Amino acid sequence: VIFGGPMSANDEQPYIRDEMKLIERLLKAETPYLGICLGAQLMARTLGARVAEHGEGFREVGYYELTPTAPGCPLFPRPMMAYQWHREGFDLPDGATLLAKGNVFPNQACRVGRNAYGIQFHPEVTEAMNRRWATRAAHMLSDPGAQSREAQLEGRRLYDDALREWLDSFLDHWLPPLDGAPAATSGAAALRQPAFS
């Protein structure tokens, strides 16, 4: 799992290049991969797709609707609101399958091969993380398209249960329990550790 961060997939720092080399090896080996936000953008760029800011300067900071595509319906059974915090999006890499789309940044979730996924949104973010981000990066809340701190916290109250349910279902699909093991030992349980609070 490669999470998000304030850097860009287009940055030329050595650690960004190293991360992309790692992603390339993981994809070639068909190792299960999940890229969240920056992690999805790095996967897309590794595969030759463009990562760029919105043409009109819009950001997605807050809750935005995702719409499933026909191939995405098993993982995205219905439209849903998802938490976002990004200024760049990714073009769909050649050979990737678009699973969910959005109105501002069209490519919101994709699959490459059998078990590599990139998602632009942040299902892992807790309320504590949301509050911290909205405080430390308050300057971004005035960017075009960004939602206020209050709107984000209200969105959390309205949409978070469904987003957590989606995350549990997705992780159990992506990393199913071992034979005979209860679902609590699955990938969903792995992201429920205190480190994510």
Role assignments for model-derived ranges:
Residues V1-L34:
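Flexible gly/pro-rich beta->alpha loop and the following alpha-helix that scaffold active-site loops
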Residues F3, C37, Q120:
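Short beta-strand segments
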Residues P14, L38, T46, D94-G95, ...:
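Generic recognition of short, well-ordered alpha-helical segments
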Residues Y15, V61-E65, A82-W85, W133, ...:
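Tryptophan-centered motif/residue detector
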Residues I16-M20, V51-A52, A100-K101, T135-A137:
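Glycine-rich, phosphate-binding/catalytic loops in enzymes
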Residues L26-R50:
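Catalytic nucleophile loop
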Residues L47-A128:
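Pocket-forming structural segment of enzyme catalytic cores
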Residues T126-S197:
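Acyltransferase
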